[in-house]
């Protein structure tokens, strides 16, 4: 009997629990909230806000402010220095380092032992549960998982306390049994130098029976190209004939889809999106025919949502899951078993279904262009690029865009810098197709483009190969969960990359 067939029954019971998402969402979420309030009742934060398991949702919302990282930073800094019972009971030993705020280079997100197990590892387990339920023929565990991670370092030299990429913290604490079905070895997986790591992974994984991949599409693509180079072949199934699925997350997969289809041309290759972040594991694509993800309702995360049109108001409406609507953009607010309380994570989502709750990620609260009232979000950009690529046969590797407030003629427009893995025959035609697609997708953009009165046609600039890689390297952000900002209301990022583009 294959190992996959042997372990499959252990996942069956969990599948029955996941089926409750359609009918018991409110009950599941209230159970999570009660558990979080009970555990935090004897913490400093819990005492400050009067937490207990008897608290109702309305009381919790009335007593607890919506918080940004800056507002929790003082508490987190004390936790990082070893103080206990601050935002979560006991000492929190792990901190996931992610991109910073306007005042700090990096954020340090607490990851408690509870959070590791009831959220992050639970997400990995449930990805397998749903995958096996959809693919009874799978032989997932008969080979190895190539899991791409970042690196970590000691946290203020406190014993057994680490700070670094979430993926590295997960690898460091993973059940030893998982190492039997994982590659590369831990030493290689946790290397800090991504370029050395990529070569070592390729060499180690080359002769393994890899059946599945897990990681960020952009960084995984770099590793897979190295594998092909080491093997001297041009398609991945020539190296790993039993490869069957890529569990991906961290960035939108749309810009990379065609490149993966060319690298892995075998029929039946599967792709499953996951919504895992430093702050928690929130969603899984349970149906390959539906791009939306199911919201994970029984982890250590309680969800709330702020309508995007109210985000900047002094007293925005904050909605629990049972009050959201489909088709509306929301900023996500989370309360977690790692001590984040009504934390504005910075991601925006739109629900596509309420039974069960399914959603798509539409962007970031800070990654958008709204310099002229056009309200362009990352979801619009991804869809527009996909349409332009489909029409021209081009393939986009990386991109960023920002407003030009006034050019030499006093005109305003959007400026796009795009690195292609396959260039369009006519860059101007590609730009026109993108501009037209954005107008179809976004009525506010269309209104501002009307007769070129407010916005001129977008400007498309071609990036030299590797310039985005070089920019990330200059920031010390190769590998892990680092990514290029797609859209910005400011020109800082695009100006830095444009300067490097001239080199």
Report residues per predicted region.
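Active-site glycine/GP-rich loop and adjacent strand/helix microenvironment
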Residues: 1-47, 52, 60-67, 75-82, ...
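Active-site diphosphate/adenylate-binding microenvironment
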Residues: 27, 31-95, 106-111, 118, ...
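Non-catalytic, beta-rich accessory domains that mediate macromolecular interactions or localization
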Residues: 84-85, 104-115, 238, 245, ...
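Conserved helicase ATPase motor motifs in RecA-like P-loop NTPase domains
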Residues: 96-102
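Short coil/turn connectors at secondary-structure junctions
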Residues: 105, 141-143, 242-243, 269
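Short strand->helix junction
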Residues: 114-117, 423-424
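DNA major-groove recognition helices of helix-turn-helix
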Residues: 123
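Conserved AMP-binding loop of ANL adenylate-forming enzymes
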Residues: 130-179
